[in-house]
Amino acid sequence: MSAVLDTPVAIRRTAMDLLARREHGRVELTRKLRQRGASDELIEPELDRLAEEGLLSEARYLESFIRYRSGSGYGPARIREELCQRGLARADIDQALRESEVNWGERMRDVWQRKFAGQRPQDPRSRAQQTRFLAYRGFPMDMIGRLLSGRDLDDY
């Protein structure tokens, strides 16, 4: 049985419990607190306080999410879309992707190697299959084209 979130202390405690497990964005944390029965009038001041204290940070959330999803084999376009769906500002997402230390060319090559054992496409059908797979994973088409034609990816 879950506790009723009808006081600022209960909301803060629940928010801190959620943040202790992993980073959350403000929108996501608000949604989770609402699902647990908290009202918006009580949520907003507590989240403001957590942000002032440095316990709630969109920048840390973005960094953590990008690191996790890129490590799972997803490219920048897919990650950008997922973060937009989670209610984060496009400008913040783009900045975090630029500042991330992910080598997207290397990441794409690793994903491609695992899936296709490094076999370059021999016919249009297999090229289309490999292109679709990498595009679905969120890698840019120009990078995919360079990889599948055997050109250098070092500038990514």
From Swiss-Prot:
A Gene Ontology cellular-component term: cytoplasm
Location(s) in or outside the cell: Cytoplasm
One GO process term, biological-process aspect: regulation of DNA repair
Pfam families in the record: RecX_HTH1, RecX_HTH2, RecX_HTH3
Broad class of the protein's primary localization: cytoplasm
InterPro entries in UniProt: RecX_HTH_1st, RecX_HTH_2nd, RecX_HTH_3rd, Regulatory_RecX, WH-like_DNA-bd_sf
PANTHER family (alphabetical): REGULATORY PROTEIN RECX FAMILY PROTEIN (PTHR33602:SF1)
Name of the protein described by the UniProt record: Regulatory protein RecX
